């Protein structure tokens, strides 16, 4: 159990039998009435965000989330197989557990897998990945009426907006959190 006075960003807690990460918190002491803590919580399983108030000093169960470094191996039907880097034990992941990150998965990529009570509750991808451009239209000189970018399909099937000078076969650095082009690799 942890007191609401000890809340900090990134802490994982159990609320209504679900695991949440605190993404924002604020101690509020109104002129009249008892103090409380206003929080913004992100559901680790679904990614949904809720706002919740806790009384000052209220005890909340702390969720003991274990993070294991694993390597993504291959896709097997609807499942994605990852191997623990220490024990070599293989774990099968679903598309729902990986979320939007499935667009950036590449074989032999290292992932952070989050476990709660022995069950996978989330997957942390690296902040950036290097992917090759599989298809993009050639940039036409002087064609900046559309804002200076064009769509490019990457080797994993993800589509991102890239500058006109990017050509097929080039390797790009992509931010997995936003899905945006960062730079050439």
Curated annotation (Swiss-Prot):
Keywords: Cytoplasm, Elongation factor, Protein biosynthesis
InterPro entries registered for this protein in UniProt: Elong-fact-P_C, NA-bd_OB-fold, Rib_uL2_dom2, Transl_elong_fac_P/YeiP, Transl_elong_KOW-like, Transl_elong_P/YeiP_cen, Transl_elong_P/YeiP_CS, Transl_elongation_fac_P
Disulfide-linked positions: none
Pathway note: Protein biosynthesis; polypeptide chain elongation
GO biological process: peptide biosynthetic process
A GO cellular component annotation in the UniProt record: cytoplasm
Location, primary (coarse class): cytoplasm
Protein name per its UniProtKB record: Elongation factor P
Species this protein is from: Desulfitobacterium hafniense (strain DSM 10664 / DCB-2)
Underlying gene: efp
């Amino acid at each position: 159990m942890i007191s609401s006075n000890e809340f900090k960003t990134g802490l994982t807690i159990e609320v209504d039998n679900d695991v949440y990460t605190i993404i924002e918190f604020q101690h509020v002491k109104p002129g009249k009435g008892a103090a409380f803590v206003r929080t913004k919580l992100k559901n680790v399983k679904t990614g949904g965000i809720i706002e919740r108030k806790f009384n000052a000093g209220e005890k909340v169960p702390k969720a003991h989330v274990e993070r294991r470094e694993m390597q993504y191996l291959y896709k097997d039907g609807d499942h994605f197989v990852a191997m623990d880097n220490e024990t070599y034990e293989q774990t099968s992941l679903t598309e729902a557990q990986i979320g939007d990150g499935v667009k950036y998965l590449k074989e032999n990529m290292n992932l952070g897998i989050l476990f709660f009570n022995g069950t996978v509750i989330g997957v942390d991808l690296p902040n950036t990945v290097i992917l090759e451009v599989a298809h993009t239209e050639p940039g036409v000189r002087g064609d900046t009426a559309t804002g200076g970018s064009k769509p490019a399909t990457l080797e994993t099937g993800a589509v991102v907006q890239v500058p006109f000078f990017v050509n097929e076969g080039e390797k790009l650095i992509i931010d997995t959190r936003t899905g945006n082009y960062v730079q050439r690799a």
